[in-house]
Amino acid sequence: MDKLLERFLHYVSLDTQSKSGVRQVPSTEGQWKLLRLLKQQLEEMGLVNITLSEKGTLMATLPANVEGDIPAIGFISHVDTSPDFSGKNVTPQIVENYRGGDIALGIGDEVLSPVMFPVLHQLLGQTLITTDGKTLLGADDKAGVAEIMTALAVLKGNNIPHGEIKVAFTPDEEVGKGAKHFDVEAFGAQWAYTVDGGGVGELEFENFNAASVNIKIVGNNVHPGTAKGVMVNALSLAARIHAEVPVDEAPETTEGYEGFYHLASMKGTVDRADMHYIIRDFDRKQFEARKRKMMEIAKKVGKGLHPDCYIELVIEDSYYNMREKVVEHPHILDIAQQAMRDCDITPEMKPIRGGTDGAQLSFMGLPCPNLFTGGYNYHGKHEFVTLEGMEKAVQVIVRIAELTAKQQ
């Protein structure tokens, strides 16, 4: 399908891992390389109003080819890959006509197994693109990037009726910064879709409310032999804090619409310890209750400490559940569902146990649910995507454009 696989393999060959804790946006030079490549390809494709901002947001417009009062719509993907696993020297494997069983990843002992990933049972006969076991693949979200670029080529090359189509490619989605610098007014779409989901048929308009919790613990270190009544062990205080967090409300014990507390990192000495939690919940009231719970725990554990020893807690909201914004515009979901059905796909409405750029954009005035890409097992060496799933995503993007043109 018009260079879809070729595009994808080219994009994943570029190391675009984002980096947390960096003030600049994009956080890595590799993202600029892909953004500049995409800008060049958009120019060659004949799109107009192409801009690449100093914060790494690439925007372009495919002009309407029919007259009428047709709303401008957008499609958005991010160019960065997760900092959770290496994205350098990605070497994809192409497994044609998958016949079941384990897939060897490279020459080591790593395998992609249907025992661990039962979804493979549903993909018999398809073409799978996997890693070699040493890196992530980057289907999150270079599959989405390739699908949008291919859909533009299909729309333009086949003279399919459509209104004005806006596209954008953003940096640093994986570290939560890309959408913060997105100029919604300049983009000019009435609504948009991120192409950043998973398996075929997924249509997502609900995501977590999210916050980060950073805890600084200052203790007092003296020689252990003379420590009685004097030492305040910051590590012990950290352990007490975590012991107060509900053990059955962690990522590994929750699913569906259940929220959680997640201790993402902890480091320290007797003198000083630092803890980093993330809090997630779909329900806004429960989300606020979780934040209060963390404050209460810190206050309880810190009670009675020497004045020079203390526990400092900082909570920062990251993003909110876009449901409350998207449901105000039900036609956006209706069009996407109809497009899927027209492509012989059963829409699967499911909550995102995470976030997307669309969550932030929805609260910035651009309602933005999430479409599937055909990818699975993101952020690790078992990541893979199906070529058939990617082709279906292209078909859905094209069909959404067609259906929107009929809405006038």
Swiss-Prot record:
<dbReference type="GO" id="GO:0006508">
    <property type="term" value="P:proteolysis"/>
</dbReference>
<keyword id="KW-0031">Aminopeptidase</keyword>
<dbReference type="GO" id="GO:0043171">
    <property type="term" value="P:peptide catabolic process"/>
</dbReference>
<dbReference type="InterPro" id="IPR002933">
    <property type="entry name" value="Peptidase_M20"/>
</dbReference>
<dbReference type="InterPro" id="IPR011650">
    <property type="entry name" value="Peptidase_M20_dimer"/>
</dbReference>
<dbReference type="GO" id="GO:0008270">
    <property type="term" value="F:zinc ion binding"/>
</dbReference>
<keyword id="KW-0479">Metal-binding</keyword>
<comment type="function">
    <text>Cleaves the N-terminal amino acid of tripeptides.</text>
</comment>
<comment type="similarity">
    <text>Belongs to the peptidase M20B family.</text>
</comment>
<feature type="binding site">
    <location>
        <position position="196"/>
    </location>
    <ligand>
        <name>Zn(2+) 1</name>
    </ligand>
</feature>
<protein>
    <recommendedName>
        <fullName>Peptidase T</fullName>
        <ecNumber>3.4.11.4</ecNumber>
    </recommendedName>
</protein>
<keyword id="KW-0378">Hydrolase</keyword>
<dbReference type="GO" id="GO:0045148">
    <property type="term" value="F:tripeptide aminopeptidase activity"/>
</dbReference>
<dbReference type="Pfam" id="PF01546">
    <property type="entry name" value="Peptidase_M20"/>
</dbReference>
<keyword id="KW-0482">Metalloprotease</keyword>
<dbReference type="GO" id="GO:0005829">
    <property type="term" value="C:cytosol"/>
</dbReference>
<keyword id="KW-0862">Zinc</keyword>
<feature type="binding site">
    <location>
        <position position="379"/>
    </location>
    <ligand>
        <name>Zn(2+) 2</name>
    </ligand>
</feature>
<dbReference type="InterPro" id="IPR001261">
    <property type="entry name" value="ArgE/DapE_CS"/>
</dbReference>
<dbReference type="Pfam" id="PF07687">
    <property type="entry name" value="M20_dimer"/>
</dbReference>
<feature type="active site">
    <location>
        <position position="80"/>
    </location>
</feature>
<feature type="active site" description="Proton acceptor">
    <location>
        <position position="173"/>
    </location>
</feature>
<feature type="binding site">
    <location>
        <position position="174"/>
    </location>
    <ligand>
        <name>Zn(2+) 2</name>
    </ligand>
</feature>
<dbReference type="GO" id="GO:0008237">
    <property type="term" value="F:metallopeptidase activity"/>
</dbReference>
<feature type="binding site">
    <location>
        <position position="140"/>
    </location>
    <ligand>
        <name>Zn(2+) 2</name>
    </ligand>
</feature>
<dbReference type="InterPro" id="IPR010161">
    <property type="entry name" value="Peptidase_M20B"/>
</dbReference>
<feature type="binding site">
    <location>
        <position position="140"/>
    </location>
    <ligand>
        <name>Zn(2+) 1</name>
    </ligand>
</feature>
<feature type="binding site">
    <location>
        <position position="78"/>
    </location>
    <ligand>
        <name>Zn(2+) 1</name>
    </ligand>
</feature>
<keyword id="KW-0963">Cytoplasm</keyword>
<dbReference type="InterPro" id="IPR036264">
    <property type="entry name" value="Bact_exopeptidase_dim_dom"/>
</dbReference>
<keyword id="KW-0645">Protease</keyword>
